[in-house]
Amino acid sequence: YVWVENDKIMGRAPGEVIEIEGNQKELKGIEHKRETTQITATLAQRAGQFIDQNKDRPFFLYYPACTVHTPLEPGAQWKGKSKMGDYGDSVQEFDWQVGRILSKLSQHNLHQDTLLIVTSDNGALTRFGREYGHSSNGPLRGEKASIYEGGHRVPFIARWLGKIPVASESREIVSLVDFIATACAAAGVELPAHVAPDSHNLLPEMMGVRQAVPVREATVCVSKFSAHLSIQQGPWKMI
């Protein structure tokens, strides 16, 4: 793993070729190895700096936290906090990350004018937390990369003060693909007809304006580890 900024690998050793070694977690040709337990804190700090630098103009921040992804390496100050191993500690550290971003938005009085979405790109791996009696996917069948619900039904939390009703819920089935149309709608940008034709604007649903027809006619998922795919329409799912 390496740091990448503006499409460039950071910390390259002068004159050396970068090569993968071992189990692909380490590279040759890097001058300074990254401190794995500081990855989360570093990313959170850079996200805060980005907000500081753009506080006076509209901005889009995509923050793909690596906290609860392997390798599970929570910061030293989080070790043992959860009483549920590295996974639980990492979940708590992620919660701190989100709180830090919220605090930064409030610091610049941007919390009223910012659409914040927290979600995941896949379901959890169920082995994490199992020894502590915890089921990462709750009652859902399957796990990450599975065609079943545990593979792709994930939490989706959105906040836009004054626009999204507090404590509201929706039963609509949506996809991460819908972020494109939703972000453009929130920014007041018209999405060209040929761009992301399978992306749907979720803002009306999020704001409590119920639609006469579903947001999506159907949702298609493909399993990474098998040839299976599923088509979900309303309460029905064909595999």
Residue ranges, per PLM feature:
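Beta-strand elements within well-structured catalytic alpha/beta cores of enzymes
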Residues: 58-64, 91-94, 98, 115-120, ...
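C-terminal cap/loop subdomain of S1 sulfatases and analogous C-terminal strand-loop tails that border
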Residues: 124-147, 164-168, 172, 177-239
